[in-house]
């Protein structure tokens, strides 16, 4: 039934043709069940395991690798001779990588869909209904409830469907609907129509929503919506419809994959076409097909070389290390890619209660009457320190501490707060914090009494558990609570009837009252001044109400409670307590004692975090279910708004936002910093608008109502104290529910991205080198310098370890002084592309050069000519060009070993270059990242392992090297450091803002030797120089290769 909240009880009952006392007939139930179905959320049909596995192979890079593995497998099948076994290693390793990636992908997908299933926990199992087949109430399965059913609910029940209340059988009905609306306190319900058809859920006071809990009272109502038509069902539909966005990093890697696949395809085809003339060479037995297959194998090797197989594993490892660091800061990351996304967050949409605030209601101001003369009066105003439930703080007047027992009015005020109260403080030993037992408002009053200590109770030596209620206990020993007149909506107050524990002539029964100021003060005839009682005059009343209005609408927007007493109440037997309508009669002729103002105070550290966000170019938006006045007041206190800033067009309620045109709503999301009284649909809409501006949005939430927006935003952040639905729909969980933790996580995300850029570029330059190597050997007609199994080893193991260690690079000191990076910013800019292409070309040329050196110039090598090397495929006994050359020498493992050793060593030097994007190694020596030094040592150890430990040399088709050969490897490898240092110098001094270095030779003073050598690590210089001198002073016939 649409808009049931706007209809009268009679209209709703008439719509379903049902009587409240008898309920539906079985015939009606049957028809309604056929029409509306079961009252349950349908199980989401997830993807089958096979569909999930196939999905993992939709990535272009993965498909290319899979194709390369299949082709390698087919070619290995037809391989002959000694290479038969080793030929199968390559396809096997590639398939192993793909299977591992698929397992991780499937596991992540399965986790993502758990959020929808978690909604099931809010479905009640049973419900109590009236139906015509029985005279009394009956318990049935909640899934069998249909629209039109008359349902009975009582304290402790979970509401089984969306219900329009028809009658309340207790004084009040309180409902905890925080999981759905985000309201921090339970809500009082009534049965009157709410005429506004566009009312938000918070304002539908005559409705009960499926999945919410009854906190107090008993009532009956008629079911108006079941299953997917309930409010919680609508949330489920939103979550099903929400497609998970790919993170900026995933998008960048997708783009990189597409570009790389095109480049790979072109190079592979080019290599194959270049060598068409060699298809008929004698080495292939004169068979054109065998020649074509041989060069096809080289093209496959090229594809394997070009794909950074280790990249997924390194990224996963780096992100996992980041999550560990974040966990230490109370940010528990559920989705690994979101770690990097945090780094480009440009908007944080934060809930108010418990995130920006403590969610611990606290009394911060109070007043009592000081003097009254006719229509004029003066007040004693006090402020109270402490913003949590901890009974620690002091009462101050004019910023100076006061002793509360010196003011008679404060003693009576504390007595009312302690006795007109059903809540208490409790010390949780496991968490080490004080917690509320009962309502937040009443717990704030309990805490106030502890801070006031009006009877000077000795508190030293008490345990924290004893301290929790020490002062309240003293007051409760003086007076005994006989009965309570519960809160009701019409009078907006509650009271307790108390008698003294030790009766005497002077002490007598009293009624203590607390409630909304306007309701209580209207029923006050007198005011308490010290220990005397003075008549309330219109002027005094106006003064009191003006102060209360100022507190309620000023910068604090306090929630005010008036406290009063009835000095001569009726005796219990003279009261008729069965009917709550009589309560107001007994709460008249009251004496006003004082007023307290409370709020959910901001967390102490939030203001500095909001300031840090502003420095980092991140906009903070508060989105709350609370009212607008309170929300704006908190925004001012924490710095989202300035103290006197005009909030017109910067703060909206959900209703005001709905009334805007779509274009105005879009503009509102661009400028606003506060949204109050919002519903789940508003949060999702705000996220959509922000995403349309290319903003990267982090959204916080804790209730079921927040789940769709959490899932839709780039970073969903759930509270540690939130619901399972919110947690499973989110990417990150805040263990301490603290906004400052989000800011710390953003800082960590930025550092992780910077490090990730370094190792991605490091791996890419390595792959460029491998591609250049294979391309050069094919273009020059040289024998194979590297084979696929060696390339896999380098890409996965020897490169993988330093790349992972680069994730430990220290973050920049000014990382939070820069604006968020543009998520569309490429991983590799034009300059960086040139830089890594240049390095890659050197890596490729050096690798081929190392193999050529062995053939042409090495002692113990064949010393063939360049022509013979580049035409080795024409080598046979009757060819005069190869006279005296043993053709078997072109299949020697030595040149391949030289090429592999140079590739590995050069990559270790490249890892050192990647310590910083533009900072020189002379100023940032290797031990700045000790993990990198360790990983380089381990990678070189693994390289020695495959060189010197049998049977590994056979598998990798390599052989041990002697000292001269190793010196040659170092000679060829070390120049890559000098080359990158030159490129860094250019970037530092001509492409970025000039730093401290000597870059402006206009004045000689700025180019002094001391200025240019400032910050150089001399220990590193003294360590490296002797090594370089020794390497390059040793003769290895290097020059002979060029003379040849």
Swiss-Prot record:
<keyword id="KW-0703">Sarcoplasmic reticulum</keyword>
<feature type="transmembrane region" description="Helical; Name=5">
    <location>
        <begin position="757"/>
        <end position="776"/>
    </location>
</feature>
<feature type="binding site">
    <location>
        <position position="514"/>
    </location>
    <ligand>
        <name>ATP</name>
    </ligand>
</feature>
<keyword id="KW-1278">Translocase</keyword>
<dbReference type="GO" id="GO:0005783">
    <property type="term" value="C:endoplasmic reticulum"/>
</dbReference>
<dbReference type="Pfam" id="PF00122">
    <property type="entry name" value="E1-E2_ATPase"/>
</dbReference>
<dbReference type="Pfam" id="PF13246">
    <property type="entry name" value="Cation_ATPase"/>
</dbReference>
<feature type="topological domain" description="Lumenal">
    <location>
        <begin position="274"/>
        <end position="295"/>
    </location>
</feature>
<dbReference type="InterPro" id="IPR001757">
    <property type="entry name" value="P_typ_ATPase"/>
</dbReference>
<dbReference type="GO" id="GO:0005789">
    <property type="term" value="C:endoplasmic reticulum membrane"/>
</dbReference>
<feature type="binding site">
    <location>
        <position position="309"/>
    </location>
    <ligand>
        <name>Ca(2+) 1</name>
    </ligand>
</feature>
<feature type="binding site">
    <location>
        <position position="702"/>
    </location>
    <ligand>
        <name>Mg(2+)</name>
    </ligand>
</feature>
<feature type="topological domain" description="Cytoplasmic">
    <location>
        <begin position="314"/>
        <end position="756"/>
    </location>
</feature>
<feature type="transmembrane region" description="Helical; Name=9">
    <location>
        <begin position="930"/>
        <end position="948"/>
    </location>
</feature>
<feature type="binding site">
    <location>
        <position position="799"/>
    </location>
    <ligand>
        <name>Ca(2+) 2</name>
    </ligand>
</feature>
<feature type="binding site">
    <location>
        <position position="305"/>
    </location>
    <ligand>
        <name>Ca(2+) 1</name>
    </ligand>
</feature>
<feature type="region of interest" description="Interaction with PLN">
    <location>
        <begin position="787"/>
        <end position="807"/>
    </location>
</feature>
<feature type="modified residue" description="Phosphoserine">
    <location>
        <position position="38"/>
    </location>
</feature>
<keyword id="KW-0109">Calcium transport</keyword>
<dbReference type="GO" id="GO:0140056">
    <property type="term" value="P:organelle localization by membrane tethering"/>
</dbReference>
<feature type="transmembrane region" description="Helical; Name=10">
    <location>
        <begin position="964"/>
        <end position="984"/>
    </location>
</feature>
<feature type="topological domain" description="Lumenal">
    <location>
        <begin position="949"/>
        <end position="963"/>
    </location>
</feature>
<keyword id="KW-0479">Metal-binding</keyword>
<keyword id="KW-0812">Transmembrane</keyword>
<feature type="binding site">
    <location>
        <position position="767"/>
    </location>
    <ligand>
        <name>Ca(2+) 2</name>
    </ligand>
</feature>
<feature type="binding site">
    <location>
        <position position="624"/>
    </location>
    <ligand>
        <name>ATP</name>
    </ligand>
</feature>
<dbReference type="GO" id="GO:0032470">
    <property type="term" value="P:positive regulation of endoplasmic reticulum calcium ion concentration"/>
</dbReference>
<dbReference type="InterPro" id="IPR023214">
    <property type="entry name" value="HAD_sf"/>
</dbReference>
<feature type="modified residue" description="3'-nitrotyrosine">
    <location>
        <position position="294"/>
    </location>
</feature>
<feature type="transmembrane region" description="Helical; Name=3">
    <location>
        <begin position="254"/>
        <end position="273"/>
    </location>
</feature>
<feature type="binding site">
    <location>
        <position position="442"/>
    </location>
    <ligand>
        <name>ATP</name>
    </ligand>
</feature>
<feature type="binding site">
    <location>
        <position position="307"/>
    </location>
    <ligand>
        <name>Ca(2+) 1</name>
    </ligand>
</feature>
<feature type="transmembrane region" description="Helical; Name=1">
    <location>
        <begin position="49"/>
        <end position="69"/>
    </location>
</feature>
<feature type="region of interest" description="Interaction with TMEM64 and PDIA3">
    <location>
        <begin position="788"/>
        <end position="1044"/>
    </location>
</feature>
<dbReference type="GO" id="GO:0070050">
    <property type="term" value="P:neuron cellular homeostasis"/>
</dbReference>
<feature type="topological domain" description="Cytoplasmic">
    <location>
        <begin position="917"/>
        <end position="929"/>
    </location>
</feature>
<dbReference type="GO" id="GO:0016529">
    <property type="term" value="C:sarcoplasmic reticulum"/>
</dbReference>
<dbReference type="InterPro" id="IPR018303">
    <property type="entry name" value="ATPase_P-typ_P_site"/>
</dbReference>
<dbReference type="GO" id="GO:0016240">
    <property type="term" value="P:autophagosome membrane docking"/>
</dbReference>
<dbReference type="GO" id="GO:0070588">
    <property type="term" value="P:calcium ion transmembrane transport"/>
</dbReference>
<dbReference type="InterPro" id="IPR023298">
    <property type="entry name" value="ATPase_P-typ_TM_dom_sf"/>
</dbReference>
<dbReference type="GO" id="GO:0014883">
    <property type="term" value="P:transition between fast and slow fiber"/>
</dbReference>
């Amino acid at each position: 039934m649409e808009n049931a909240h706007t209809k009268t009880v009679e209209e709703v009952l008439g719509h379903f043709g049902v009587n409240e006392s008898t309920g539906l007939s079985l015939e009606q139930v049957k028809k309604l069940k056929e029409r509306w179905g079961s009252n349950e959320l349908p199980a989401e049909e997830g993807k089958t395991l096979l569909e999930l596995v196939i999905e993992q192979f939709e990535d272009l890079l993965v498909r290319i690798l899979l194709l390369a593995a299949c082709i390698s497998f087919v070619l290995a099948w037809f391989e002959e001779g000694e290479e038969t076994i080793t030929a199968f290693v390559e396809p096997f390793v590639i398939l192993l990588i793909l299977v591992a990636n698929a397992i991780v992908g499937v596991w992540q997908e399965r986790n993502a869909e758990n959020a929808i299933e978690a909604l099931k926990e809010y479905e009640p199992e049973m419900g109590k209904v009236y139906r015509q087949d029985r005279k009394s109430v009956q318990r049935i399965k909640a899934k069998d409830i249909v629209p039109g059913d008359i349902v009975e609910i009582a304290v402790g029940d979970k509401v089984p469907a969306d219900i329009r209340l028809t009658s309340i059988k207790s004084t009040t009905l309180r409902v905890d609907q925080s999981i759905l609306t985000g309201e921090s306190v339970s809500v009082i319900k009534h049965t009157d129509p709410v005429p506004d058809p566009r009312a938000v859920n918070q304002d539908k006071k005559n409705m009960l929503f499926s999945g919410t809990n009854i906190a107090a009272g008993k009532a009956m109502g008629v079911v108006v919506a079941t299953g997917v038509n309930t409010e919680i069902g609508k949330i489920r539909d939103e979550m099903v419809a929400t497609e998970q966005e790919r993170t900026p990093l995933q998008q960048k890697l997708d783009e990189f994959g597409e570009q790389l696949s095109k480049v790979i395809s072109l190079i592979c085809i080019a290599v194959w076409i270049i060598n068409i003339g060699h298809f008929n060479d004698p080495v292939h037995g004169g068979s054109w097909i065998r020649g074509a297959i041989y060069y096809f194998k080289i093209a496959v090797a090229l594809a394997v070389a070009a794909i950074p197989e280790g990249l997924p594993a390194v990224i996963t490892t780096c992100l996992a290390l980041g999550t560990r660091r974040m966990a230490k800061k109370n940010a528990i990351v559920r989705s690994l890619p979101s770690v990097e996304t945090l780094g480009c967050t440009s908007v944080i949409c934060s809930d108010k209660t418990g995130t920006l605030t403590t969610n611990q209601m606290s009394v911060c101001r109070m007043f009592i009457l000081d003097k009254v003369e006719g229509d004029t009066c003066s007040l004693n105003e006090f402020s109270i320190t402490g913003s949590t439930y901890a009974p620690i703080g002091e009462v101050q007047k004019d910023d100076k501490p006061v002793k509360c027992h010196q003011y008679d009015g404060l003693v009576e005020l504390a007595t009312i707060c302690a006795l007109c109260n059903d809540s208490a403080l409790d010390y949780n030993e496991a968490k080490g914090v004080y917690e509320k037992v009962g309502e937040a408002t009443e717990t704030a009053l309990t805490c106030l009494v502890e801070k006031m200590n009006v009877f000077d109770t000795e508190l030293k030596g008490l345990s924290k558990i004893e301290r929790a209620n020490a002062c309240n206990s003293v007051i409760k020993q003086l007076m005994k609570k006989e009965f309570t007149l519960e809160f009701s909506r019409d009078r907006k107050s509650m009271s307790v009837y108390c008698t003294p524990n030790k009766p005497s002539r002077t002490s007598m029964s009293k009624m203590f009252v607390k409630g909304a100021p306007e309701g209580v003060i209207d029923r006050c005839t007198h005011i308490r001044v010290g220990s005397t009682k003075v008549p309330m005059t219109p002027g005094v009343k106006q003064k009191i109400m003006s102060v209360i209005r100022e507190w309620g609408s000023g910068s604090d927007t306090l929630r005010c409670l008036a406290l009063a007493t009835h000095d001569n109440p009726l005796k219990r037997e003279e009261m008729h307590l069965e009917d709550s309508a009589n309560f107001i009669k007994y709460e008249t002729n009251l004496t006003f004692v004082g007023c307290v103002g409370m709020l959910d105070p901001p967390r102490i550290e939030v203001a500095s975090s909001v300031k840090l966000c502003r420095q980092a170019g991140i906009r903070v938006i508060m989105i709350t279910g609370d009212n607008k006045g309170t929300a704006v007041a908190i925004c001012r206190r924490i710095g989202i708004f300035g103290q006197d800033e005009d909030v017109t067009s910067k703060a909206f309620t959900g209703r005001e936002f709905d009334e805007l045109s779509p274009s105005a709503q879009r503009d509102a999301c661009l400028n606003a910093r506060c949204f109050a009284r919002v519903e789940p649909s508003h949060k999702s809409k705000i996220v959509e608008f922000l995403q349309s501006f290319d903003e990267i949005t982090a959204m916080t939430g804790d209730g079921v109502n927040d789940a769709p927006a959490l899932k839709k935003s780039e970073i969903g952040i759930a509270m540690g104290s939130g619901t399972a639905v919110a947690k499973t729909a989110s990417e990150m969980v805040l263990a301490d529910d603290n906004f400052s933790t989000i800011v710390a996580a953003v800082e960590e995300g930025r550092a992780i991205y910077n490090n990730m850029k370094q190792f991605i570029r490091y791996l890419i330059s390595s792959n460029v080198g491998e591609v250049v190597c294979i391309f050069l050997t094919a273009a020059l007609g040289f024998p194979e310098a590297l084979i696929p199994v060696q390339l896999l080893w380098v890409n996965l193991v020897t490169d993988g370890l330093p790349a992972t260690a680069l994730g430990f690079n220290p973050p920049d000191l000014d990382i939070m002084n820069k604006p968020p990076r543009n998520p569309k910013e490429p991983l590799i800019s034009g300059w960086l592309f040139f830089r890594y292409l240049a390095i890659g070309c050197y890596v490729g040329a050096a690798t081929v050069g190392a193999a050529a050196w062995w053939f042409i110039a090495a002692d113990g090598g064949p010393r063939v000519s360049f022509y013979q090397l580049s035409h080795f495929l024409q080598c046979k006994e009757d060819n005069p060009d190869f006279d005296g050359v043993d053709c078997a020498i072109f299949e020697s493992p030595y040149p391949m070993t030289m090429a592999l050793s140079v590739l590995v060593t050069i990559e270790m030097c490249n890892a050192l270059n990647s310590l910083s994007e533009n900072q020189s190694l002379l100023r940032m020596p290797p031990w700045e990242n000790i993990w990198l030094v360790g990983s380089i040592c381990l990678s070189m150890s693994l390289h020695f392992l495959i060189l010197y430990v049998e049977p590994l040399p056979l598998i990798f088709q390599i052989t041990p090297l002697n000292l001269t050969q190793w010196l040659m490897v170092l000679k060829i490898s070390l120049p890559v450091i000098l080359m990158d240092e030159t490129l860094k110098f250019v970037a530092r001094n001509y492409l970025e803002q000039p730093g401290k270095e000597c870059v402006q030779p206009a004045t000689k003073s700025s180019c002094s030797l001391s200025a240019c050598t400032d910050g150089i690590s001399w220990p590193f210089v003294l360590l490296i120089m002797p090594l370089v001198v020794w390497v390059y002073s040793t003769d290895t016939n290097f020059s002979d290769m060029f003379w040849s």
